[in-house]
Amino acid sequence: MSRVGKSPIALQGAEVKLADGSITVKGPLGTITQAVNPLVNVANNDGTLNLSPVDDSREANALSGTMRAIIANMVQGVTKGFERKLTLVGVGYRAQAQGDKLNLSLGFSHPVVHQMPEGIKAETPTQTEIVIKGIDKQKVGQVAAEVRGYRPPEPYKGKGVRYADEVVILKETKKK
């Protein structure tokens, strides 16, 4: 059995509903629904969730660990939430959050407007910082990657959009 799949999930203030083939996690920040793979059994035991593979196959074993990680992220998302911080490095690079849109000035001849998907919010504490928040870890990471993709850090000066914890290794310029 998967080492990850063995450990139980603590439901820290979240409600869980197990329907046929899906799991719904409800917490103070919102609700997330996810389909459960039929090769995985989910059991709710007094504030903890236990997952186990249906049989001893390698696939069921692997999927039990994967489903456990996904459900644990759902519980964390509806109780604490997820956030991803981005920084803009470069002269004139600016960001501004307006409702469900993120306006970016990234050195192009036109401003870049990124539409936020449902359930994801963007904040700009300063003009060169972006904080993307939401309850779905996958969506938060996807939106952060899309915003970074508009102008990834270039290897010579490091200009561009980068994750706050990202280390950009700079190349040396060509010498004669």
UniProtKB/Swiss-Prot annotation:
NCBIfam families in alphabetical order: L6_bact
InterPro entries tied to this protein: Ribosomal_uL6-like (IPR000702), Ribosomal_uL6-like_a/b-dom_sf (IPR036789), Ribosomal_uL6_a/b-dom (IPR020040), Ribosomal_uL6_bac-type (IPR019906), Ribosomal_uL6_CS (IPR002358)
Keyword terms of this UniProt record: Ribonucleoprotein, Ribosomal protein, RNA-binding, rRNA-binding
Function in brief: This protein binds to the 23S rRNA, and is important in its secondary structure. It is located near the subunit interface in the base of the L7/L12 stalk, and near the tRNA binding site of the peptidyltransferase center.
Gene name for this UniProt entry: rplF
Pfam name, any one: Ribosomal_L6
Stored SUPFAM superfamilies: Ribosomal protein L6
Domain of life according to the entry: Bacteria
Annotated PANTHER family: 60S/50S RIBOSOMAL PROTEIN L6/L9, LARGE RIBOSOMAL SUBUNIT PROTEIN UL6M
Name of the protein: Large ribosomal subunit protein uL6
